[in-house]
């Protein structure tokens, strides 16, 4: 299937000074799109933190938040007002600020970050809700939500109802501040297979809803920071484990280089764990005194997240493809994203009717994942641009009996037919892909799908973009095609039969094929009444008859007298 293309149906992009890929919007539209997305994120954020429910998948929210920051940087706008952190509802001060964690993009950046740092450990990045636990005189005194990192809500009553969180401590932990992640306890959770399950939102919901004490039994705690705790990491982990925070010791590994981090990351991605994760955190054993901790300034730790199972991608254009059967398919061209090491630049939407139901236009943000065999799949539309500039689909008069001959309206189906006849299912013309067929047709203006048979070696060699070796290969392929058996040629003519049915029919010439009755076709494997009727229609089609006469004049096997 080939694509109808038009710049009028897409959006242009440009690179900002920061290197970000930016939509080439007029200033007014850029301001409007940024404001709309900012407001939508704020609304989702408000619902999430006030009602404990998620209106959108966690991963989608995170990616759209990053997209907003990108757009703001494109236009030189301050990003400090981006609503990606919880609204400040609580007024309880954290004894020690939550620093947050810097995200590292890939292994190369991880290597750069690790360079010059020593005594490094790696832990799973548990996906849940951050909390501060304050122990005084051996008792849990306060539990505070992360909030803005400096102050948050008092969650003490709810946290005291979670059985997995120790209510009393001894020794150095009798008077201590701990920071960690409240998570949804899982049995044998394999992240690669099971995904994130919106775990963060589920935990937030449990903590915010009233009268749900029994649900809190399913929550656990992973401590990732003990400010001003023992300087020796093994000692720190040992004391936490003795106090009932055993997961931290179990899932903390010494690492010396990025390879070891990568191995741990891959292992935790594919192994059964008791919690949902979204990456790993690398941290230095040596931390500054807690009085120096500030939100956004924790340079002693960094995260390397897992690649998302699905990516939010921006639609850059809508294109229509017409297959050899005349079926029109809609394809969305995308600003490229990486999924499982695969560069995804387009996704098949389906029929025109399905595209209209999806209501997708250039500028929209869609969620794309990989289906079987790595084929990009459209999952949902997560954000629609204000401007709805959509192309008009081509006329739907194409069918399985159109465009054997070239014309202005038949351009795409005609190219699809050339690609089909060159495939291994038909004539097997090695090296003849879409680009080669387009170049030949554009240069030599084919009359019909077999016009290439009359090209000379000189004509092929003079085709723009064809190197000497390639033109010689094509010349040989075209000559070898003349020796192909009759059944291969009628497959190239798109007879509506399977190869098995053709073999069972036993036809070796056009004359034999003309003598067959509809009853004969019905009796062939996988044929039946409907397909038999289509074979008769195909055989009686004027373009097919004209092609058979032309092939006879070219002395193609089975078509001559």
Swiss-Prot record:
It is an enzyme of class 6 (ligase). Gene3D superfamilies: 5' to 3' exonuclease, C-terminal subdomain (1.10.150.20), DNA ligase/mRNA capping enzyme (3.30.470.30), Helix hairpin bin (1.10.287.610), Nucleic acid-binding proteins (2.40.50.140). Pfam families: DNA_ligase_aden, DNA_ligase_OB. It catalyses: NAD(+) + (deoxyribonucleotide)n-3'-hydroxyl + 5'-phospho-(deoxyribonucleotide)m = (deoxyribonucleotide)n+m + AMP + beta-nicotinamide D-nucleotide. The keyword DNA repair applies. One of its GO terms (molecular function) is DNA ligase (NAD+) activity. GO terms for biological process: DNA repair; DNA replication. InterPro entries: DNA_ligase_AS, DNA_ligase_B, DNA_ligase_CS, DNAligase_adenylation, DNAligase_N, NA-bd_OB-fold, NAD_dep_DNA_ligaseB, NAD_DNA_ligase_OB. Keywords: DNA damage, DNA repair, DNA replication, Ligase, NAD. Its EC number is 6.5.1.2. PROSITE patterns: DNA_LIGASE_N1 (PS01055), DNA_LIGASE_N2 (PS01056). It comes from the Bacteria. The keyword NAD applies. The active site is at residue 125. Catalyzes the formation of phosphodiester linkages between 5'-phosphoryl and 3'-hydroxyl groups in double-stranded DNA using NAD as a coenzyme and as the energy source for the reaction. Belongs to the NAD-dependent DNA ligase family. LigB subfamily. PANTHER family: DNA LIGASE (PTHR47810), DNA LIGASE B (PTHR47810:SF1). NCBIfam families: PRK08097.1. This is DNA ligase B. It comes from Salmonella newport (strain SL254). The gene is ligB.
């Amino acid at each position: 299937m080939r694509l109808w293309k038009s710049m009028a149906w897409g959006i242009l992009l440009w690179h900002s000074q920061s290197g970000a890929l930016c939509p080439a919007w007029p200033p007014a539209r850029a301001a409007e799109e940024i404001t709309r997305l900012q407001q939508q994120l704020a609304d989702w954020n408000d619902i999430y933190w006030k009602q404990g429910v998620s209106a959108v998948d966690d991963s989608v929210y995170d990616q759209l938040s990053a997209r907003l920051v990108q757009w703001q940087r494109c236009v030189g706008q301050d990003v400090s007002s981006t609503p990606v952190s919880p609204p400040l509802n609580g007024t309880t001060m954290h004894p020690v600020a939550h620093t947050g964690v810097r995200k590292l993009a890939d292994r190369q950046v991880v290597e750069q970050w690790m360079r010059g740092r020593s005594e490094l450990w790696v832990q799973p990045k548990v996906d849940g809700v951050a909390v501060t636990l304050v122990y005084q005189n051996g008792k849990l005194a306060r539990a505070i939500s992360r909030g803005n990192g400096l102050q948050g809500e008092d969650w003490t009553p709810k946290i005291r109802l979670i059985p997995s969180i120790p209510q009393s401590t001894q020794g150095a932990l009798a008077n201590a501040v701990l920071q960690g992640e409240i998570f949804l306890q899982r049995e044998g959770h394999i992240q690669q297979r099971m995904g994130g399950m919106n775990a963060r939102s589920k935990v937030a919901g449990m903590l915010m809803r009233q009268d749900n004490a029994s649900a809190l039994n399913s929550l656990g705690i992973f401590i990732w920071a003990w400010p001003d705790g023992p300087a020796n990491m093994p000692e720190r982990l040992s004391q936490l484990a003795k106090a009932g925070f055993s997961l931290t010791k179990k899932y903390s590994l010494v690492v010396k280089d990025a390879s070891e981090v990568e191995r741990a990351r891959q292992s935790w991605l594919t192994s059964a764990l008791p919690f949902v994760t979204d990456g790993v955190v690398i941290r230095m054993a040596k931390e500054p005194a807690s009085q120096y901790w500030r939100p956004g300034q924790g340079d002693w730790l960094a995260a390397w997240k897992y690649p998302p199972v699905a990516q939010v991608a921006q639609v850059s254009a809508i294109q229509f493809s017409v297959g050899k059967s005349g079926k029109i398919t809609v394809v969305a061209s995308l600003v490229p994203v990486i999924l499982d090491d695969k560069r995804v630049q387009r996704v098949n939407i389906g029929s025109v009717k399905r595209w209209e139901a999806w209501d997708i236009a250039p500028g929209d943000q869609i969620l794309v994942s990989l289906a079987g065999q790595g084929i990009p799949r459209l999952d949902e539309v997560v954000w629609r641009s204000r401007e709805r500039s959509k192309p008009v689909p081509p006329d739907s008069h194409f069918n399985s009996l159109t465009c054997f001959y070239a014309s202005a309206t038949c351009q795409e189906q005609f190219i699809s037919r050339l690609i089909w006849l060159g495939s291994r299912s038909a004539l097997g013309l090695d090296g003849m892909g879409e680009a080669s067929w387009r170049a030949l047709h554009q240069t030599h203006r084919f009359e019909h799908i077999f016009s290439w048979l009359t090209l000379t070696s000189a004509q092929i060699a003079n085709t723009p973009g064809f190197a000497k070796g390639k033109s010689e290969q094509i010349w040989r392929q075209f000559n070898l095609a003349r020796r192909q058996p009759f059944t291969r040629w009628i497959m190239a003519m798109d007879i509506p039969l399977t190869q098995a049915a053709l073999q069972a029919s036993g036809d070796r010439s056009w004359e034999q094929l003309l003598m067959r009755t509809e009853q004969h076709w019905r009796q062939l494997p996988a044929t039946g009444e409907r397909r038999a009727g289509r074979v008769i229609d195909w055989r009686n089609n004027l373009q097919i008859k004209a092609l058979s006469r032309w092939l006879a004049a070219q002395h193609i096997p089975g078509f001559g007298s």
